[in-house]
Amino acid sequence: MNLFRFCSGLKVLGYFMILLVVAVVGVSYYAVVVSTWWPILIRGDHGALSALAALIIFVFHFLLIMLLWSYFTTVFTDPGSVPEHFRREMGGGDSLEAGTSTDQGAFGSLGYCTKCRNVKPPRCHHCSVCQRCVLKMDHHCVWIVNCVGARNYKFFLLFLFYTFLETMLDVIVLLPSFIEFFSQAIKHSSSPGKLASLVLAFVLNFAFVLSLLCFVVMHISLLSSNTTSVEVHEKNGEVRWKYDLGKKKNFEQVFGKKKAFWLLPLYSKDDIDNITSLEGLEFPTCSDIDP
């Protein structure tokens, strides 16, 4: 029985996950901005509190814009597949047999995909959901209906980063309402439905904060060692992973060298032209830079 044929169903699930992301954003927006801080701001009868409301609303919208920008860039960016010119240059895999590899100079050790029946560059893996080989594949993410690979890994990390900050902000500003829900004040509340929506938003954001914290820590560790989620199982206890070039170079392979672009879900033209790893075909190893 081929279980991989059911993987295509994950794509259908992914479209519902996009709607779920939009729904959570909508609930959070209503709870934080519409119900809580916007009324305080427009009343303007509390100097310090109004200033705090303005600050919270500004930060909330800034993080929301960066979150959605990073998210949809990740969704709509091709993670990278083996280009046709690469297959032609490498002979289409005719010289390779299934399960073998060979050294091809600048491209390092090439592999062979038994499903695509073609040659593949280093760090490239076959995705059973997308039905193709993905360059520097990290994993297939149902939340974005896409693979995370060489060309959208930075955008995915920024999506995690901004989502974590946004949900953390929501948890902090909604905490008083959550506490109020369990106090005697709920019995005297003129709008229990509004209070319930605030509590729902708090619970959802708190759950996301906990899960995202684990995910962010994991990917910081992977980024610092220049490792993907797939490659964690390939390292086989190596003292030093062959693609680990040091934390600075590892970071630049994903985020580029232009600091002004590090927190934006896009690359500078110089980085695209000069960093081969962003194309997902060539990756220097530690033996290339060690004296």
From Swiss-Prot:
Instruction: List residues traversing the bilayer.
Output: 14-34, 49-69, 155-175, 198-218
What are the UniProt keywords, alphabetically?
Answer: Acyltransferase, Cell membrane, Lipoprotein, Membrane, Palmitate, Transferase, Transmembrane, Transmembrane helix
Residue ranges annotated for the DHHC domain, each copy included = 111-161
- Cellular localization per UniProt: Cell membrane
* Catalyzed reactions per annotation: L-cysteinyl-[protein] + hexadecanoyl-CoA = S-hexadecanoyl-L-cysteinyl-[protein] + CoA
Active site as annotated: 141 (s-palmitoyl cysteine intermediate)
Q: Name one GO cellular component term.
A: plasma membrane
GO MF terms on file?
protein-cysteine S-palmitoyltransferase activity
- What does the function comment of this entry state? Palmitoyl acyltransferase.
User: What is recorded about the protein's domains?
Assistant: The DHHC domain is required for palmitoyltransferase activity.
Query: What is the protein's given name?
Result: Probable protein S-acyltransferase 12
